[in-house]
A protein has these predicted regions:
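A short helix-loop-beta-strand connector motif used in the catalytic cores of GNAT acetyltransferases and
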Residues: 1-13
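Conserved beta-strand in the GNAT
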Residues: 10, 16-26, 44
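Acyltransferase donor/substrate-recognition loop-hinge adjacent to the catalytic core
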Residues: 103-173
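Glycine-rich, positively charged N-terminal anion/phosphate-binding segment
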Residues: 23-37
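Secondary-structure transition/capping motifs at alpha-helix termini
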Residues: 14-16, 30, 68-70
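Acyl-donor binding region in acyl/amide transferases
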Residues: 34-122
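Feature marks short, surface-exposed loop/turn motifs that line or immediately flank catalytic pockets
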Residues: 27, 81-85, 133
Length: 173
């Protein structure tokens, strides 16, 4: 987060925490073309939790104000600090366990955020595939093509070189 600016907010009622939110923007993302999703003037809020709709709206308004005061003219949210962390709201599948790098929130957040003026920017999907069933044929075909391509190397992570391999994975993502 060397190139990001952020402010954290905590809502209290009677001295007791009842919600939280982050307001943030990535200076590198501001330089991207808007067609790539961010672009000039785009800020975000995330790390969102609220006890009720009134708290939710107060926190969202505070995050929007902070972003506006720093020149942001558009808000893409919720995104927890980076698009590479937890983007979006879970709107279906609350009966399933959380997925890696995907938000998992209370069902009512969808309507609270919509009533705060937000609409869907992009639908994100996760899939639950029991490993004992193996991969679908399409995935197997893609892997086979990759194995035949001399420019692609498929190998397990080398635990003795974990930092190096983690950097490679992050670079790919």
């Amino acid at each position: 987060h060397d190139h990001a600016k952020m402010q954290l907010f905590l809502a209290r009622r009677g001295g007791r925490p009842v919600g939280r939110i982050s307001a943030h923007y990535d200076e590198l993302a501001l330089e991207q073309p808007p067609e790539q999703g961010m672009g000039p003037g785009t800020g975000n809020w995330g790390l969102f939790e609220a006890e009720d709709e009134a708290v939710a709206h107060a926190l969202i308004a505070k995050a929007e104000e902070w972003l506006r005061n720093r020149g942001m003219t558009r808000v893409l949210a919720p995104i927890s600090l980076s698009i590479w962390e937890e983007p979006g709201l879970l709107v279906k599948g609350h009966d399933h366990p959380p997925m890696v790098m995907m938000g998992h929130n209370r069902p009512e957040y969808e309507s609270w955020v919509e009533r705060a003026g937000y609409t869907v920017a992009k639908r994100l999907l996760t899939y639950d595939l029991p490993v004992e069933q193996g991969f679908p044929p399409l995935v197997n075909r893609i892997v086979a093509l990759g194995e035949k391509n001399e420019r692609i190397r498929i190998r397990p992570v080398d635990k003795s070189q974990f930092k190096r391999d983690a950097a490679i994975i992050i670079d790919i993502l």
